[in-house]
């Protein structure tokens, strides 16, 4: 398979060289689909040069990362290329790398989705934001993603949701300010490559992919 912008080894090397590795690169990772092994306190303080509440959960940290990514993207002029911004803006590249380390088990498939340009937002109604997406590999293979109600129709999402005991932990209070997790009440919202790709595209919706 031919590699695209976000999956090529040379592109990843250039991104690594254009900005220092974030603190998150030192954290351990497991195969658990709910993201373990992240020191929330240290990572929160390192994130975007901002001091966050030491009690921050990984969910709130990821939300802050995505919000910061979106803020940086919105500062760019129209028709700015995502790939160019990643190579030229150190702060943006650092945010991108932080996400790639946190989601190490899902990053490559999500980047393949971005490269294929197979995912797009569904039509919006008045007052809606970009939360409903569709990934279409071919006419017989469509996946629906909803970032508000935190759902994906793919088999990976269903498997991860029911395979993780932490999906059934005591629910957390709903926080409308958190980007990651939507209305899901779990401390560790279920992850799949489609959810990740859609979340990144929503944050960078004004950039040229």
UniProtKB/Swiss-Prot annotation:
Source organism, top-level taxon: Eukaryota
The keyword Manganese appears for this protein: no
Keywords: Cytoplasm, DNA damage, DNA recombination, DNA repair, Metal-binding, Nucleus, Zinc, Zinc-finger
Signal peptide location: none
Extent of Polar residues compositional bias: 1-30
Function of the molecule: Involved in early stages of the homologous recombination repair (HRR) pathway of double-stranded DNA breaks arising during DNA replication or induced by DNA-damaging agents.
Name of the protein described by the UniProt record: Zinc finger SWIM domain-containing protein sws1
Claim: Coiled coil is one of the keywords in the record: no
Location of region: Disordered: 1-33
Subcellular location: Cytoplasm; Nucleus, Nucleoplasm
One Gene Ontology biological process: recombinational repair
Quaternary structure and interacting proteins, as annotated: Interacts with rdl1, rlp1 and srs2.
Zinc finger SWIM-type: from-to: 143-203
Principal place of residence: cytoplasm
Organism: Schizosaccharomyces pombe (strain 972 / ATCC 24843)
GO MF assignments: zinc ion binding
A cellular component annotation (GO) from this entry: cytosol
């Amino acid at each position: 398979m031919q590699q695209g912008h976000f999956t090529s080894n040379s592109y990843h090397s250039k991104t690594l060289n254009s900005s220092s590795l974030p603190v998150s690169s030192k954290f351990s990772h497991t195969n658990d689909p709910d993201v373990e092994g992240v020191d929330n306190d240290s990572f929160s303080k390192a994130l975007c040069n901002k001091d966050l509440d030491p009690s921050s959960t990984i969910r709130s940290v990821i939300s802050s990362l995505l919000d910061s990514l979106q803020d940086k993207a919105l500062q760019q002029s129209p028709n700015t290329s995502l790939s160019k911004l990643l190579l030229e803006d150190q702060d943006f590249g650092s945010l991108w790398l932080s996400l790639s380390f946190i989601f190490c088990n899902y990053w490559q498939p999500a980047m393949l989705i971005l490269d294929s340009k197979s995912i797009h937002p569904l039509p919006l109604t008045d007052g809606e934001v970009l939360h409903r997406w569709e990934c279409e590999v071919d006419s017989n293979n469509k996946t629906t993603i909803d970032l508000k109600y935190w759902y994906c129709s793919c088999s990976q999402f269903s498997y991860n949701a029911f395979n993780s005991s932490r999906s059934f932990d005591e629910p957390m209070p709903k926080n409308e300010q958190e980007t990651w997790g939507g209305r899901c009440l779990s401390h560790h919202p279920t992850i799949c490559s489609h959810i990740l790709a859609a979340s990144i595209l929503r944050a960078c919706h004004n950039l040229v992919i």
